[in-house]
């Protein structure tokens, strides 16, 4: 198997392990076993488990930001909705394991591995809202993105327990996030007032 194909297979296996068993399961040994390679082979490709996790973070950031970018463009065109964007963001941190991976990397002292995620989000927002890059521009969508990501991260970590404790539906946070996104879209002029939330 060519080197790039082997790396790609390892990252996909790492993503599957992350979703199935959490970030602590994403080890060179486990990924090697999953793709029928040796530990030494993966060590050659990545150098360490931390570098494998960083490659996984890059992969997650690219795929999630790609999906969110597509959903945002669809919402602008009137064939998608802000709720789809919110669901993609929340699911990336919850079901896809993004929050668990981010927390694990930070607790392991591998904070630098989060840079690809942060940078991918920044690039996406700059691409979708270039007007906010101008000097003295209002950063409506940048600020909304920060809030949306932090809501999604927090919900993935303690959302279910907190909702139960407060006696509210867990879905409430997604509804509030959608309302915030719609308000910001209207303020930024990227959505018609009559469009579907």
Model-identified regions with their sequence ranges:
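Hydrophobic alpha-helical connector segments
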Residues: 55, 66-99, 134, 141, ...
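Amphipathic alpha-helical packing segments from all-alpha helical-bundle domains
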Residues: 64-68, 106-146
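Amphipathic alpha-helical segments used for helix-helix packing
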Residues: 87-122, 160
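Helix-turn-helix
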Residues: 9, 13, 17-51, 55
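Short, Lys/Arg-enriched anionic-surface-contact patches
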Residues: 1-6
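C-terminal peripheral helix-coil segments that are non-catalytic and often amphipathic
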Residues: 123-131, 157-197
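Outer-membrane beta-barrel translocator/channel fold
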Residues: 150-157
């Amino acid at each position: 198997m060519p080197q790039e194909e082997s790396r790609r297979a390892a990252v996909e296996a790492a993503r599957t392990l992350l979703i199935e068993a959490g970030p602590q399961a994403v080890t060179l040994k486990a990924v090697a076993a999953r793709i029928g390679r040796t530990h030494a082979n993966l060590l050659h490709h990545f150098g360490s488990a931390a570098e494998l996790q960083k490659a996984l973070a890059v992969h997650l950031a690219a795929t999630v930001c790609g999906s969110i970018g597509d959903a945002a463009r669809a919402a602008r065109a009137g064939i998608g909705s802000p709720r789809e964007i919110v669901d993609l963001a929340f699911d990336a941190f919850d079901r896809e394991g993004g929050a668990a991976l981010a927390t694990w990397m930070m607790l392991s002292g591998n904070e630098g591995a989060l840079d690809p995620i942060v940078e991918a989000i920044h690039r996406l927002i700059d691409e979708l809202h270039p007007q906010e890059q101008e000097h003295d521009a209002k950063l409506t969508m940048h600020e909304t993105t920060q809030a949306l990501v932090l809501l999604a991260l927090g919900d993935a970590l303690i959302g279910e327990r907190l909702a139960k404790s407060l006696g509210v539906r867990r879905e409430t946070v997604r509804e509030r996030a959608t309302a915030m996104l719609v308000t910001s879209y209207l303020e930024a002029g990227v959505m018609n007032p009559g469009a579907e939330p």
